[in-house]
Amino acid sequence: MKNLFVLFLIFCASFCFAQKEDLRKAIKEESINGALDFSKMLEEKYSSAPFIRFGNTLYNKKDFAILLWGAKVKNLGIESLDETIKLWEEIHNKKLTTPESKALKVGFKTKFE
């Protein structure tokens, strides 16, 4: 019985890991020119506006797209801010700047309904 329980735990852990890897892969695929690329939508919707107000802060379109990406990734199931930052940097092959990092953190912590 004890061995069966251990095998069950190992199976559950490997299944959860596989699901998380599938999620990361899907996020990577959709983040550039896909459903998680908010830059085109923002450019179309706010073409004449240089900045977008969110709360008491003005964001340029690039940073606001990162904010929306952070919120969506959290909503999809990535629970760690550090993992989200690392994932964004892997996708874009560069480190986040300070304003980009702040926008990502705000998006990650914001609950959209």
Short names for language-model regions:
Residues C16-A71, N75-E83:
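Glycine-rich short-loop/terminal segments
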Residues L4-A13:
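Sec-dependent N-terminal signal peptides
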Residues S80-E113:
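Active-site or metal-binding loop neighborhoods of secreted/extracellular toxin and effector enzymes
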